[in-house]
UniProtKB/Swiss-Prot annotation:
The keyword Chloroplast is assigned to this record: no
Binding partners and assembly: Self-associates. Forms filaments. Interacts with EcpD.
Family per similarity comment: Belongs to the EcpA/MatB fimbrillin family.
Gene field: ecpA
Primary site of residence: other
Organismal lineage: Bacteria, Pseudomonadati, Pseudomonadota, Gammaproteobacteria, Enterobacterales
InterPro entries for the chain: EcpA (IPR016514), Fimbrillin_EcpA_sf (IPR038478)
GO cellular component: pilus
Signal peptide: 1-22
Organism: Klebsiella pneumoniae subsp. pneumoniae (strain ATCC 700721 / MGH 78578)
Name of the protein in question: Common pilus major fimbrillin subunit EcpA
């Protein structure tokens, strides 16, 4: 009888040790959304981004994902207009790492296969040259009607270059420092009504 009690006590002691040695592992992440609110229904041209951009590094491809960034365009019609042109131009596209490394990433912007550059305008609509704007064609059809016309389309955004410290370019994104980059990607839209 004493042997059974001793054996049960030993088994209980060993079982208790196994439980005591196991440690809980937890991880936590915080998601942050920047938020603003704006309403403008009177300007001649209003462009509203529909969402935000978040690039994630993928180890398997040693690169960052690309994203479709949708936007809404609203214009006020001009009944005296005989032609309409809408262009876009890249203004800012640098993301900077939020530490002391100075590492940067450059975001490329593409519209229907054409790069949107800082050095020139990308034509989105030009009714005089029969460029009707694809998904923005409602604007090409409504620019000379009374009232407002809206349409939605999107850019493709991707990371096109990076630096480890603000000056030293990288060809292999796996060599970038760990961390988070932040910044703005701004595109200027210009609309011209010709009378």
């Amino acid at each position: 009888m004493k042997k059974k009690v001793l054996a049960i006590a030993l088994v209980t002691a060993f079982t208790g040790m196994g439980v005591a040695q196991a440690a809980d592992v937890t991880a936590q992440a915080v998601a942050t959304w920047s938020a603003t609110a704006k309403k403008d229904t009177t300007s001649k041209l209003v462009v509203t981004p529909l969402g935000s951009l978040a690039f994630q590094y993928a180890e398997g491809i040693k690169g960052f994902n690309s994203q479709k960034g949708l936007f809404d365009v609203a214009i006020e019609g001009d009944t005296t207009a005989t032609a309409f042109k809408l262009t876009s131009r890249l203004i800012t596209n640098t993301l900077t790492q939020l530490d002391t490394s100075g590492s940067t990433l450059s975001v490329g912007v593409d519209y229907n296969g054409a790069a949107v550059e800082k050095t020139g305008d990308t034509v989105m609509i030009d009714t005089a040259n029969n460029i009707m704007g694809g998904n923005l064609s409602a604007l090409a059809n409504g620019y000379n009607a009374s009232g407002r016309t809206t349409a939605q389309d999107g850019f493709t955004f991707s990371i096109i270059s990076g630096t480890t410290n603000g000056t030293t370019a990288v060809t292999d994104y796996s060599t970038l420092p760990e961390g988070i980059w932040s910044g703005d990607v701004s595109v200027q839209f210009d609309a011209t009504w010709t009378s």
